[in-house]
Swiss-Prot record:
Residues 34-115 form the Inhibitor I9 domain. Belongs to the peptidase S8 family. Glycans are attached at N251. It comes from Trichophyton verrucosum. This is Subtilisin-like protease 1. One of its GO terms (cellular component) is extracellular region. The keyword Ribosomal protein does not apply. One of its GO terms (biological process) is proteolysis. The active site is at D158 (charge relay system), H190 (charge relay system), S345 (charge relay system).
Length: 399
């Protein structure tokens, strides 16, 4: 289970012989009294409904006796085709009762996930677009096929998006707000920036793709894992009902401590046909300790600088699939105009945008997209980092 260990303090070990694991997140920032519960893979819809009815009764009984937690109860319900679960605010006794249900796989404390980008100076030269369509650094033009991602939908699972920004030309819509803050806008600027790189007319790679904003992080750039999982679930269902998951891309320029729940949700999205681009993280350390970057089925992206070196902040290691421009990237700013940001958060949308572009151009989908990106890329990155299996920088093959 990697960094996980059994809780041995206040929650105690569940005495039932077949009790589910109650995982601990010793190196993560946890949300007080908030948990994610994952059911076993063979849980039927009837089993899940029965468990929810039982949970409501049990939770009500426990809270009535103690009344120690405010606003408690289920918050999100997850229902992928092969993964069921939920999250909520529960007291310790309820968590121990949940773990005793033989249909529960594990219980995981909810943790804080954050963006992988930071604002730097404004008005620096833009270079990322030119770099991904030319074999050498220093070019000044972006060469691309006129199909430009048409027919593909990109899901920005982020801080929200200014869908009215002129660079989106009306191709961006608001989808879902899992933060539940009543603020359907991008108060951070992070999500608008990453989205501009993916689909913007001026700043973007897939200039004809559509974009759906899925807000899972607040205006401070952080949010609970439970909301991220809910955002993934919502995106998969929306894609399934609107053109199909095989014509959908998801970008996740975010991450936090290793989470089985988050990795399983990301894997479910890939299994159902979506392509997922994930930021490796900005801690100059092994990305294997971060989620969702450590999930093997996603395309995990490290950041490169303008001279084709690995960005000094970029994570590295066996989880890395590709590198993409991430230092000093110019893209859209909420309210209009542009700004510069750096981070693996800026690298991942280059991959997501190029994925949408290739899906429209070549008709590929899902896991085949990451493989195709590796084929088209150039072996350009210097100092890819310890244990990193690739030095490939993405390229569109010169259109």
């Amino acid at each position: 289970m990697g960094v996980f260990r059994f809780i041995s303090i206040s929650l105690a070990a569940v005495s039932a012989a077949n009790a589910a694991q109650i995982l601990s997140m010793p190196h993560a920032q946890t949300v007080p009294n908030s948990y994610i519960v994952m059911m076993k893979d063979d849980t039927s819809d009837d089993d899940f409904n029965h468990h929810q009815s039982w949970l409501q009764s049990t939770h009500t009984h426990n809270i009535t006796r103690r009344a120690t937690i405010q606003n408690a109860g289920m918050r999100h319900k997850y229902n992928f085709s092969k993964m069921k679960g939920y999250s909520g605010i529960f007291d310790e006794e309820t968590i121990k009762d949940i773990a005793k249900d033989p249909k529960v796989m594990f219980v995981e404390p909810d943790t804080i996930i954050s963006v992988h980008g930071k604002v730097e100076q404004s008005n620096v030269p833009s270079w990322g677009l030119a770099r991904i369509s030319n074999p050498q650094p220093g070019a000044g033009s972006y060469i691309y096929d006129s199909s430009a991602g048409e027919g593909i939908t990109v899901y920005s699972v982020d801080t929200g998006v200014d869908v009215n920004h002129e660079d989106f030309e009306g191709r961006a819509i608001w989808g879902s707000n899992q933060v539940n803050d009543g603020d359907d806008r991008d108060g951070s600027g992070h999500g608008t920036h990453t989205s501009g790189t993916m689909v913007g007319k001026e700043f973007g790679i897939a200039k004809k793709a559509k974009l759906v904003a899925v807000k899972v992080l607040g205006n401070d750039g952080s949010g609970p894992t439970s909301g991220i999982v809910a955002g993934i679930n919502w995106s998969v269902e929306h894609a399934r009902q609107n053109g199909g998951t095989k014509k959908a891309v998801m970008n996740m320029s975010l991450g936090g401590s290793s989470s089985s729940a988050l990795n399983r949700a990301a894997a479910q999205a890939v299994e159902q046909g979506m392509f997922l681009s994930v930021a490796a993280g900005n801690d100059n350390q092994d990305a294997q300790s971060s989620s969702p970057a450590s999930e093997p089925s996603v395309c995990t992206v490290g950041s490169s600088a303008e001279d084709d070196s690995r960005s000094s902040f970029s994570n590295w290691g066996p989880a890395i699939d590709l590198f993409a421009p991430g230092s000093n990237i110019i893209s859209a700013r909420p309210g209009g105009g542009s700004q510069s940001m750096s981070g693996t958060s800026m690298a991942a949308p280059h991959v997501a945008g190029l994925a949408a572009y290739l899906m429209a151009l070549e008709g590929i989908s899902g896991g085949a997209v990451c493989d195709r990106l590796k084929e088209l890329g150039t072996s350009s990155i210097t100092d890819a980092g310890p244990g990193t299996p690739t030095n490939v920088l993405i390229n569109n093959g010169g259109a």
